[in-house]
């Protein structure tokens, strides 16, 4: 028997294992996963198109960095503004009031633990959770609001807004890692 819960949704079911396959039936919905070293992965959990990996507690399999997607790996690292554009401005600018160097206007340091440190105009704003889907990076922050598009040339377009400012930054990955 198995008990299953995701958020407030719960269910009961049965499981079985044979060779490297793990069968799980919850509330009549059957899923087949693959047994790995210290984990079990389901490519299409509950028919929702979502890959879910269960890791054995206390093992390296618990490290989320092991399961980064290609899109997520693109954003990992330090990024800095190369240009900035005001909402009603004259196009991209390479200087900005309040900073000596445009790269200090916005810096993003995406970590493999899925948190990003945000520095705006040289001041650390905070560290926020992030996720990537379909070419966009969502940063879980309301103020400032950060909307990130991953460009085809592996640069980032970042829309930044807070109570006072609204800018679009074009960011490049820093040379230093």
Model-derived features with residue positions:
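Lipid interaction determinants
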Residues: 1-129, 133-177
């Amino acid at each position: 028997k198995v008990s299953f819960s995701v958020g407030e949704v719960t269910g009961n079911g049965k499981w079985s294992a044979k060779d490297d396959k793990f069968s799980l039936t919850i509330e009549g919905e059957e899923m087949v996963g693959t047994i790995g070293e210290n984990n079990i992965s389901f490519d299409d959990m509950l028919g929702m198109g979502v890959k879910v990996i269960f890791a054995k507690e206390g093992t390296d399999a618990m490290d989320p960095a092991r399961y980064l997607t290609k899109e997520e790996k693109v954003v990992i690292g330090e990024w800095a503004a190369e240009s900035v554009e005001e909402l009603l401005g004259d196009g991209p600018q390479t200087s900005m009031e309040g900073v000596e160097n445009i790269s200090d206007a916005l810096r993003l340091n995406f970590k493999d633990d899925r948190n990003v440190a945000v520095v705006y105009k040289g001041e650390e704003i905070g560290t926020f959770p992030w996720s990537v889907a379909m070419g966009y990076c969502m940063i879980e922050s309301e103020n400032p609001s950060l909307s990130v598009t991953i460009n085809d040339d592996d640069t980032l377009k970042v829309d930044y807004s807070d109570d006072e400012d609204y800018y679009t930054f074009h960011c490049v990955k820093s040379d230093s890692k």
